[in-house]
């Protein structure tokens, strides 16, 4: 066999192997379910209607003895922004839901489907934990993942059993230490937007795409049991989108003392009483992305 012929054969074989390996990596990242864990029985929903008898419901509000939700829409920076003001009688009504009621990579469903599964009243997409194999994950008191993130700053949102919020840095505390303090939820997307009533990001904050205008999603606390859910549209002719600094300002203007950035872009979705409130997009077209998890309000 001549050297030239050998080189051609080797090139073909190498190309086939490289293509197969690339396909496997993409499938492992986006398609193949991995490390699947069923949600603990105590965290599963009952499958009954979450709305209380006698609840007063409109297109933009819900009120019963335990939950009060009011949704408003405003224009900010040439963008439609949807703001849900939530007041609860108990922190247990603020919950997290997993797609298909399972934890694992590539276990996905739309925010709408997971909200229906959980019998939610109000829901937004979560931190899309399944897109990464690192970052602390706790849902409804169950600690699923304890692997620290790789970045210098990995800010998590911790929600405690009394309804208080805290921004925690994974480099400074373990997931087990957070759990021991009474945490019930840990989200690991970030960054934090507001802490102690002070905006913690600005236009120069170095986060991938942070200074670009995108659809956004955030959750904040005014005080324990009083929360704000925010989703903005973006990437359309009608709505430009927000940068992180813009999003932080929206949360401050809503009265938040603590606020945290959740997964945005095509994931950004707000759902209320069976309907998507905002305009989620992919490639400029209406499309509700399938994601790993949601944050929601429910009985």
Language model features with spans:
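Zymogen propeptides
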Residues: 2-150, 166
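Active-site-adjacent helix-turn-beta-strand microarchitecture at beta-sheet edges
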Residues: 62, 129-210
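Beta-strand-turn-beta hairpins that frame and shape the catalytic cleft
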Residues: 79, 91, 164, 221-228
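Extracytoplasmic
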Residues: 79-81, 117-118, 152, 188, ...
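Short beta-strand segments
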Residues: 85-87, 124-126, 160, 220, ...
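Short, solvent-exposed aromatic-acidic interface loops
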Residues: 99-103, 171-175, 232-236
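General beta-strand structural signal in soluble alpha/beta enzymes
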Residues: 122-126, 159, 167, 258-262
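Conserved, well-ordered active-site substructure
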Residues: 133-151, 204-257, 262, 267-299
């Amino acid at each position: 066999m001549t050297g030239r012929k050998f080189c051609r054969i080797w090139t073909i074989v190498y190309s086939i192997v490289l293509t197969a390996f690339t396909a496997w990596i993409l499938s492992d990242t986006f398609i193949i379910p991995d490390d699947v864990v069923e949600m603990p029985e105590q965290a599963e929903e009952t499958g009954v209607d979450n709305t209380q008898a006698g609840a007063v419901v409109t297109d933009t509000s819900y009120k019963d003895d335990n939950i009060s939700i009011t949704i408003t829409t405003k224009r900010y920076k040439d963008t439609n922004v949807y703001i849900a003001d939530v007041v609860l009688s108990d922190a247990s009504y603020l919950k997290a839901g997993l797609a298909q009621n399972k934890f694992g990579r590539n276990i996905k469903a739309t925010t709408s489907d997971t909200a229906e599964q959980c019998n939610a009243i109000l829901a937004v997409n979560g931190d899309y934990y399944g897109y990464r194999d690192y970052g602390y994950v706790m849902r409804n008191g169950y600690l699923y993942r304890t692997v620290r993130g790789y970045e210098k700053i990995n800010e998590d949102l911790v929600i405690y059993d009394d309804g208080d919020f805290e921004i925690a840095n994974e480099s400074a505390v373990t997931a087990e230490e957070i759990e021991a303090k009474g945490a019930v939820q840990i989200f690991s997307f970030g960054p934090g937007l507001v802490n102690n009533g002070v905006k913690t990001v600005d236009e120069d904050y170095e986060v991938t795409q942070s200074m670009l205008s995108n659809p956004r999603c955030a959750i904040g606390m005014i005080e324990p049991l009083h929360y704000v859910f925010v989703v903005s549209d973006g990437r359309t002719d009608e709505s430009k989108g927000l940068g992180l600094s813009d999003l932080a300002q929206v949360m401050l203007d809503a009265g938040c003392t603590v606020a945290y950035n959740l997964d945005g872009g095509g994931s950004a979705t707000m759902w209320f009483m069976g309907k998507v409130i905002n305009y989620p997009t992919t490639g400029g077209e209406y499309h509700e992305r399938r994601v790993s998890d949601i944050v929601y309000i429910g009985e």
